[in-house]
């Protein structure tokens, strides 16, 4: 009798434990899936995630400070909102983890929207861009067809890499599609002759060619057309709306055009146009 009672009690205790454990797990899951985002207030910190090897959008200046077109836009937004601006360099292939953990508030660094529309909560696009090939002027490479059997460098986890994956009929003709850590490495490889071409953003390519005074040229071929936007964690419409409205204000009063003139010698922004 005592053995039977002990068995009944043991089974009852086990069932209760399993039930409670499952219930706790479900509640935790529900709690995590219902993350709420709120507007930032004056004095709050606003952390911008960026690739520090991506001039002119975001990079380390000669004075050792972080600078660039996108970072200047972010600074102006923070100034108008009364936020504390923080620029945080990140590994580009870790950007999603940084955003998900709350280590950064947004990704703002020549961030391509195309193909990622459902992955983030986006601002309106503020720049048009193309993915292109950069080659040496004396290479004899005149079109994308001349890249057959050649070494083409591309940054890891970049829009150019994704675009070339979509154009397998072209990339399959390359001798080697070499993935590098950043565009600076690719351009140095191009300069040394260890790479024949670099697939990259035309906005960045034009700036780099002028800055380096390099004998490079951009092929008249568009790998992909795209738009740049500011990417926030999925569902973070509150802060997105604050940033977006400030960018629209900056476009209206000419501040955005002024910053564009500084970096590109012309206004290439598209907000409010």
Predicted regions and their residues:
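Immediate post-signal peptide segment of exported/extracytoplasmic ligand-binding proteins
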Residues: 26-66, 79, 140-151, 273
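Short helix-initiation/N-cap motifs at beta->coil->alpha
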Residues: 71, 86-98, 177-192, 226
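A ligand-binding cleft/hinge motif common to bilobed small-molecule-binding domains
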Residues: 94, 110-119, 163-168, 191-225
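Acidic, polar ligand-binding/catalytic clefts
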Residues: 75, 79, 84-146
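Extended ligand-binding regions for polar small-molecule ligands
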Residues: 23, 71-80, 150-151, 156-159, ...
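Bilobed "Venus flytrap"/periplasmic-binding protein-like clamshell domains
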Residues: 52-55, 66-79, 111, 132-187, ...
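Periplasmic-binding protein-like
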Residues: 52, 128-135, 202, 206, ...
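Ligand-binding clefts/hinges and TM-proximal coupling segments of bilobed small-molecule sensing domains
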Residues: 24-38, 42, 84, 159-178, ...
């Amino acid at each position: 009798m005592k053995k039977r009672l002990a068995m009944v009690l043991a089974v009852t205790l086990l069932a209760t434990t399993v039930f409670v454990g499952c219930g706790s797990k479900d509640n935790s899951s529900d709690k995590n899936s219902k993350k709420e985002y709120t507007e930032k207030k004056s004095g709050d910190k606003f952390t911008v995630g960026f690739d520090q090897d991506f001039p002119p959008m975001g990079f380390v200046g000669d004075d050792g400070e972080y600078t660039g077109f996108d970072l200047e836009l972010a600074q102006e937004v923070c100034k108008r909102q009364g936020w504390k601006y923080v620029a945080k360099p990140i590994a580009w292939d870790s950007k999603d983890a940084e955003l998900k953990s709350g280590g950064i508030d947004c990704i703002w660094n020549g961030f391509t929207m195309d193909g990622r529309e459902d992955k983030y909560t986006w601002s309106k696009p503020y720049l048009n861009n193309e993915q292109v090939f950069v080659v040496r002027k004396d290479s004899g490479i005149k079109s994308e067809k001349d890249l057959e059997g050649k070494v083409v460098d591309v940054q890891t986890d970049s829009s150019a890499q994704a675009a070339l994956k979509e154009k397998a009929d072209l990339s399959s003709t390359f001798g080697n599609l070499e993935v590098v850590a950043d565009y600076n490495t690719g351009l140095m490889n191009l300069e040394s002759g260890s790479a024949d071409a670099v697939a990259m953003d035309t906005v960045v390519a034009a700036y780099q060619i002028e800055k380096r005074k390099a004998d490079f040229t951009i092929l008249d071929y568009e790998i992909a057309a795209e738009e740049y936007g500011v990417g926030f964690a999925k569902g973070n419409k509150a802060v997105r709306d604050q940033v977006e409205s400030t960018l629209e204000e900056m476009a209206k009063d000419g501040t955005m055009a002024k910053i564009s003139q500084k970096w590109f010698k012309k206004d290439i922004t598209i907000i409010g146009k």
